[in-house]
Amino acid sequence: IVGQISLGAIDLGSMRTGVIGYWVDQRYAGHGFAPMAVALLADWAFCDPTGPRLHRMEIALLPENERSRRVACKVGCHYEGVRPRYMFVNGQWRDHETYSLFAEDAGDGFIHRLIARHAMPESVQS
């Protein structure tokens, strides 16, 4: 197994929101699997007629988890701030940074933008 991605805490009421969670096996980390999975999930959840047609999704990550932060940034997430004592991790309540995606950000699709961005030479991306 390369990893896992999930969309949970879905609210189909007035908020139309969900929470993205993911992990990647250490052997496959850094190869682009997580950003690709998040982009595909976002396109499905926001735009696909078979998806829940959400308005907002969020990712919460530990402040020291630089790899997860890079995933959120590569996909185009918006940094929202730190949530104190947000999640119980390894026996203690830990602060988490929160990042969000919005349906209005989808444009031609998160996956399309991710592929296009990484297909361009790095000097052109800036």
Residues of each region from the PLM?
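Acyl-donor (CoA/ACP) binding surface of acyl/acetyltransferases
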Residues: 1-126
